[in-house]
């Protein structure tokens, strides 16, 4: 039920606020015995959610239902969720799949900013070499569980094993 709510029936600000932070039992005790602390914490979470929304340039969508977002906007929202918990290592599996070029550029910009300004590290699985080339250096190209190539994207695009594996022989 929570996944359904976070995924589609909440506005993006509220969706970000649902991301669990500290999971200690302390929060339950505070909710029962110190309601003013809970109100203060909720205010801080709301403020952080708005910072994340602004950082990702989604302020024009802050009240939009998450379920109404495009695929690329949902992927930006997913990045926002990692920001809510201050994840410093983020694994991205084909983050660019199904995303239009404009939003892919926005997604790349957000990833770059998170890396440079906030110290996030990304491990990405991606097939779009142009997208990866903008974000990663070096790259590792794998096929069927084996490393085919390790080096720059430009060199990967010229490597015979990479070309054969991904483009086939004409």
For each feature predicted by the language model, list its residue ranges.
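Conserved ABC ATPase "signature" region
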Residues: 17, 24-61, 109-112
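Catalytic Walker B motif of ABC-type/P-loop ATPase nucleotide-binding domains
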Residues: 90-93
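Helical segment within the ABC ATPase nucleotide-binding domain
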Residues: 105-118
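A short, surface-exposed alpha-helical micro-motif characterized by mixed small hydrophobic
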Residues: 132-134
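Single conserved hydrophobic/aromatic residue that forms the stacking wall/gate
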Residues: 1-7, 12
